[in-house]
Amino acid sequence: MEFSVKSGSPEKQRSACIVVGVFEPRRLSPIAEQLDKISDGYISALLRRGELEGKPGQTLLLHHVPNVLSERILLIGCGKERELDERQYKQVIQKTINTLNDTGSMEAVCFLTELHVKGRNNYWKVRQAVETAKETLYSFDQLKTNKSEPRRPLRKMVFNVPTRRELTSGERAIQHGQAIAAGIKAAKDLGNMPPNICNAAYLASQARQLADSYSKNVITRVIGEQQMKELGMHSYLAVGQGSQNESLMSVIEYKGNASEDARPIVLVGKGLTFDSGGISIKPSEGMDEMKYDMCGAAAVYGVMRMVAELQLPINVIGVLAGCENMPGGRAYRPGDVLTTMSGQTVEVLNTDAEGRLVLCDVLTYVERFEPEAVIDVATLTGACVIALGHHITGLMTNHNPLAHELIAASEQSGDRAWRLPLGDEYQEQLESNFADMANIGGRPGGAITAGCFLSRFTRKYNWAHLDIAGTAWRSGKAKGATGRPVALLAQFLLNRAGFNGEE
């Protein structure tokens, strides 16, 4: 779908459809009031007759309104004006896109971006409208042979901004929104792909294709098991021993700043393309969803695509830690003691706590890049789901300024995170009689002890950990990958690059 931005009066628009808001109870938005005045009270008369209350989700399509050049006007219920927040705004946009498609509109001029959303500027409203529109239209049907094509005639959406001064920020918002939406789609597509197709080799092929598409400043290197062995990544290798699919680590390097002292930001994504639990095997119910255990790597891939598309003037490295955790004659066992790349030893008490065993070696590997910061993204613990549910990502870090940056980016993007503690007292739960540490610390504070485990491998740089176990995918009727936290990380990198969304 094509997006553009303009500034103009609603009555002068020659379009198939104009979209304006109506508040509860039967209150016209400022733009709707202009149209009502031009049409000699036509719209307000309809509202007085009870045609539309303005409740969220309500719609009313008007044809050939007097003195209005556009063929149709779509009135969208926005709820109570003072209660219009970010979440409600996105729901209004979603309802708009679905209604326009259902009613056969091929193009529309949308004035909803002029609604007042507390604390949000026009850049934010336009960008979120683009991202929400793309999200609304997303479907994953690549593997279906009998595809039912939904009715989607809408091809062009024009967002109106109040004055010409905001056109530049509006155009930038569309550019950013489309790049972020494409990154989210890429992450969702990878996450939704079945594990018999999406293994570590498939992740590597996607990483190579990204380098081919943006060859000017993207390089991809794939590190196989033999190289991992030479590097001493025995913990990473142990997790994949039971699988016939080779473990592969894909390193995507984007260089947007040629300065010698420009240190990279490193993103590390857990890429367990299927996690059976290994010898500590999971229950069969819901095990199919363990294809989503690579959503951290999928998110990193999506972010790298966004960075390359926007040609951000920073250096970013994305690592996709591809692996598969399966039971078998060669699988690692509870009781094994592994020597990590850092030289520290780990007693395996549960083979289903495997993500941290992969990540710890990758976190050691990335020291060679002398990073400005390292952020790992992982569907790491069920404990984080218990703590925060399915709405907010867990954040842990060894660096307060980095925490503040990420929390701010999560608020800006609407892809929210919440900081969990990382106190020394939790480290005691990882003590082992037979190694430097155990790979689990018991049930209490399980998300935090997992973060504590990783923190032991991140002492040489500023580091943050995002536990997306509760936010990476949805179950039930709307089952599928969410693409989170692509939006959060994209905003973080946009801020680092100087594009903080201020007008």
Curated annotation (Swiss-Prot):
Residues binding Mn(2+) 2, per UniProt: K270, D275, D293, E354
Residue numbers annotated as active site: K282, R356
Catalytic reactions of this protein: Release of an N-terminal amino acid, Xaa-|-Yaa-, in which Xaa is preferably Leu, but may be other amino acids including Pro although not Arg or Lys, and Yaa may be Pro. Amino acid amides and methyl esters are also readily hydrolyzed, but rates on arylamides are exceedingly low; Release of an N-terminal amino acid, preferentially leucine, but not glutamic or aspartic acids
Compartment(s) of residence: Cytoplasm
InterPro entries named among the record's database cross-references: Leucine_aapep/pepB, Macro_dom-like, Peptidase_M17_C, Peptidase_M17_leu_NH2_pept, Peptidase_M17_N
An example Gene Ontology CC term for this record: cytoplasm
Manner of cofactor binding, per the entry note: Binds 2 manganese ions per subunit.
Primary location recorded for the protein, binned into one broad class: cytoplasm
CDD domains per record: Peptidase_M17
Domain of life: Bacteria
Keywords, in A-Z order: Aminopeptidase, Cytoplasm, Hydrolase, Manganese, Metal-binding, Protease
Swiss-Prot/TrEMBL GO biological process terms: proteolysis
E.C. number: 3.4.11.1, 3.4.11.10
GO molecular function: manganese ion binding; metalloaminopeptidase activity
Any Pfam family matching the protein: Peptidase_M17
Cofactor: Mn(2+)
Sites where the protein binds Mn(2+) 1: D275, D352, E354
Role summary: Presumably involved in the processing and regular turnover of intracellular proteins. Catalyzes the removal of unsubstituted N-terminal amino acids from various peptides.
Family: Belongs to the peptidase M17 family.
Protein name, UniProt field: Probable cytosol aminopeptidase
